[in-house]
From Swiss-Prot:
A motif (Conserved undecapeptide motif) lies at residues 90-100. It is found in: Secreted; Host cytoplasm. This is NLP effector protein 3. PANTHER family: DOMAIN PROTEIN, PUTATIVE (AFU_ORTHOLOGUE AFUA_5G00600)-RELATED. Induction: Expressed strongly at the early stages of host infection (up to 24 hours after infection) but subsided quickly afterward. It comes from Plasmopara viticola (Downy mildew of grapevine).
Length: 223
């Protein structure tokens, strides 16, 4: 058998992982704290990789900012990864978008955005969000603790938007949004994890793979 090779497929052909029944406390807490995402402009989130490790080919920055990417017929996906970090528990939630296009002639193929939800420890009862750190271009914005108006119960609310001519980013919002099926890093197939570790995404960077994840927690640490 030859070396593993990346395989890109049409952005609308990537099927998401169904959300598994959570078994461990960590998995149950990750599902409980799934954030809401409100898309103000641009693409809606799409699956980035399938069970075989085939990856989303994305879209050129042509047409309208939301052209050809208003939602996958197969359903969307939010990815997750968690870890203990500096005495607290971090859960990263990650979305993939086929293009990041604030307007014609601006932007790039592929976009990854994410938010890190910080809690004291993974417990099913009386879990409390200590902070949220959404990705904001090359860094993070931080709310310690989150504004109550930016929460819907245990779901932190975020908006995906662009302030022209700058590319899209996340910020907390009062607006309600949608949740997607969650698949955690350890729940994915080995082919999918390998693809997310190896495949290049141009100007966008996968924030939760083995080579990047802990560094992102370090950069976003809000305390």
């Amino acid at each position: 058998m030859g070396p593993w090779e990346a395989k890109w497929i049409r952005h609308s052909d990537v099927r998401p992982f169904p959300q598994p029944e959570p078994m461990t406390v960590e998995e149950k807490v990750a599902v409980m704290l799934k954030p809401e995402l409100h898309v103000s402009s641009g693409c809606h989130p799409y699956p980035a990789v399938n069970d075989l490790g085939e990856t989303n080919g994305g879209l050129k920055t042509t047409g309208a900012p939301s052209g050809m990417c208003k939602g996958s017929g197969w359903g969307s996906q939010v990815y997750g990864r968690h870890a203990s970090f500096r005495g607290v528990w971090a859960i990263m939630y990650v979305w993939y978008f086929p293009k990041d296009m604030p307007s014609a002639h601006f932007g790039h193929r592929h976009d990854w955005e994410h938010v890190i939800v910080w809690i004291e420890k993974p417990v099913v009862e009386n879990v409390k969000i200590l902070a949220v750190t959404p990705s904001f271009h090359d860094g993070y914005s931080k709310q310690v603790p989150p504004d109550p108006s930016h929460l819907n119960g245990l779901a932190a609310k975020f908006i995906y938007e662009s302030e022209w001519p700058i590319n899209h980013a996340l910020r907390p919002t009062r607006k309600g949004g949608k949740k997607q099926d969650l698949i955690l890093w350890e729940q994915m197939s080995s082919n999918a994890r390998h693809a997310l570790n190896i495949v290049p995404w141009g100007a966008a960077n996968t924030p939760f793979n083995d080579f990047v994840f802990m560094g992102r927690l370090e950069k976003a640490f809000p305390f």
